[in-house]
C-alpha cells in the first residue's frame, strides 16, 4: 500500500506529532510510506520518502495557513507531474485535509471555541504580548473551525478518526448526522519506554537533580497550555493537604511567572518545581508518586496513558478523553468536577495516606495501558485504510476501547 502522511510536525516528543511518528515507524516496514511535514525527527529517512513542506513558524495562525496552502499545492503539483500515486493520504490534523481521504482529528475545534467563548477556558491577556497572542489564537481557532466544518460536511467521502469517545460525542453534538461515520481509535503508548521498572534507574537520580528527598511525596503534571489543563487547581489544592512536604513538579512551558505568583499567594512556592519541556518524561514518571491532570478540556491526553503505563495512579477530570480508560477507584481516580479543588485535595490525600492503594491502583493502571500499544493503533488504522479502499459502508467499522471498560460511564461535569 502506498501511504502518505501529512502532518505539520513529526517527532516522538509530544502530542499529535508523536501519534504520526509511531504510525510512520510501524507502517513503513510493510508499506511504501511518504511523509509531508515542516519538521521531522526520530524517523529513519532511509525507510520513508520525505517531502519538506515550507511554512512560517509563527504566529500560529499564519503557520497553519501557510502549511495548509503549501502542502495542498505540493500534493497537487506532484499529482499533475504524475510523481505520486497514493492509495491513502492520511492527514493527522486539518493541515492539508482537503487532499486526504483519511483524517485524524485530535481536537474538536468547535467544542473548544464554545468553552473559550463561555470563558470556561480563559485566554490570558495579562500583558501586551499575551493580548497579541490572544488575537492570533482567535484567528487560529476561527480558521480551524472553518476547515473542520468543511471536512465533516464531506465526511461521506473520507474516513474521519477521533481519539476518544468523548470527541465522538462532541462531533455528534456540533455536527449532527454529518458526523455519523466518525471512527474512534484511542491513542497508544510505548509500554516498553514507559514502564514501572524505570523507578530502579531514574527515581533517585531525578529527585536528587531537583532537590526532592526520598521521603517527600511527589505529584507530577506534564503539558503546555496550563490554563486549559488545570494547573491552577493543583496549586490551589496544595495548601489544603495535611502533609507539608508534598512537592509538585510541573513539566512544560507556559506563563511560569503568573503561576509562580499564584503559588506565592497560596504560600506553596517553595514546594513547586518548574521544569521546561523534557523529551525524557519517562524519567519523571519514575520519580513521581501520583500523576495529577485536572484538565478543563482534553480530547485524549497522552500523558495520562503514559503515567498509567509507568505504573502511576492517576487523578484526572471526567472530561479528559483518556478518562474513557479509567474505572474510578480501580485503575485511577476521577474528579467530580475539574474545578473542585477540595475534591482534588481529598483524592490526593486518599492516595498519599494509603501506600497499598497507590501500589494496587498503579498496577491496575499498567494492565490497562498494556491494551493500548502503538502496534494495536497501527493495526486498527490499517483496518480503516482497507475500509476506505474497498469503500463499504463506514458505518460498520467502529474501533473503540475494550468492551469491559465501556461498562462504567464517567462522562460529566
What spans do the regions from the language model cover?
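A conserved mid-protein helix/loop that constitutes part of the nucleotide-sugar donor-binding site
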Residues: 17-22, 217-240
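Carbohydrate-associated surface elements
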Residues: 166, 188
Amino acid at each position: 500500500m502506498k501511504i502518505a502522511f501529512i502532518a505539520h510536525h513529526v517527532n516522538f516528543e509530544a502530542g499529535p506529532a508523536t501519534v504520526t511518528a509511531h504510525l510512520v515507524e510501524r507502517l513503513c516496514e510493510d508499506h511504501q510510506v511518504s511523509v509531508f511535514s515542516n519538521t521531522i525527527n526520530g524517523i529513519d529517512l532511509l525507510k520513508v520518502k520525505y517531502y519538506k513542506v515550507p511554512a512560517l513558524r509563527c504566529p500560529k495562525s499564519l503557520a497553519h495557513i501557510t502549511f495548509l496552502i503549501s502542502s495542498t499545492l505540493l500534493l497537487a503539483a506532484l499529482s499533475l507531474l504524475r510523481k505520486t500515486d497514493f492509495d491513502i493520504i492520511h492527514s493527522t490534523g486539518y493541515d492539508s485535509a482537503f487532499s486526504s481521504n483519511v483524517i485524524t482529528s485530535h481536537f474538536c475545534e468547535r467544542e473548544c471555541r464554545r468553552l473559550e467563548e463561555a470563558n470556561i477556558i480563559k485566554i490570558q491577556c495579562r500583558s501586551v504580548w499575551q493580548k497579541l497572542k490572544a488575537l492570533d489564537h482567535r484567528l487560529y481557532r476561527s480558521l480551524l473551525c472553518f476547515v473542520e466544518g468543511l471536512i465533516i460536511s464531506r465526511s461521506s467521502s473520507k474516513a474521519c478518526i477521533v481519539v476518544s469517545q468523548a470527541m465522538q460525542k462532541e462531533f455528534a453534538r456540533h455536527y449532527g448526522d454529518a458526523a455519523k461515520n466518525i471512527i474512534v481509535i484511542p491513542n497508544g503508548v510505548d509500554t516498553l519506554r514507559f514502564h514501572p521498572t524505570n523507578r530502579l534507574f531514574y527515581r533517585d537520580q531525578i529527585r536528587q537533580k531537583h532537590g526532592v528527598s526520598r521521603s517527600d511525596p511527589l505529584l507530577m503534571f506534564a503539558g503546555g497550555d496550563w490554563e486549559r489543563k488545570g494547573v491552577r487547581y493543583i496549586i490551589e489544592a496544595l495548601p489544603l493537604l495535611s502533609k507539608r512536604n508534598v512537592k509538585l513538579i510541573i513539566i512544560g512551558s507556559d506563563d511560569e511567572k503568573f503561576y509562580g505568583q499564584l503559588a506565592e499567594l497560596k504560600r506553596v512556592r517553595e514546594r513547586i518545581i518548574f521544569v521546561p519541556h523534557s523529551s525524557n518524561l519517562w524519567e519523571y514518571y519514575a520519580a513521581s508518586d501520583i500523576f495529577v491532570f485536572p484538565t478543563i478540556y482534553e480530547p485524549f491526553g497522552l500523558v495520562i496513558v503514559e503515567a498509567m503505563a509507568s505504573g502511576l495512579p492517576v487523578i484526572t477530570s471526567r472530561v479528559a478523553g483518556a478518562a474513557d480508560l479509567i474505572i474510578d477507584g480501580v485503575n485511577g481516580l476521577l474528579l467530580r468536577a475539574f474545578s473542585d479543588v477540595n475534591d482534588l485535595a481529598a483524592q490526593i490525600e486518599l492516595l498519599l495516606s494509603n501506600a497499598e492503594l497507590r501500589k494496587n491502583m498503579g498496577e491496575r493502571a499498567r494492565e490497562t495501558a498494556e491494551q493500548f500499544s502503538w502496534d494495536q493503533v497501527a493495526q486498527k488504522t490499517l483496518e480503516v485504510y482497507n475500509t476506505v479502499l474497498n469503500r463499504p459502508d463506514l458505518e460498520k467499522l467502529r474501533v473503540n476501547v475494550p468492551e469491559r471498560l465501556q461498562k462504567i460511564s464517567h462522562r460529566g461535569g
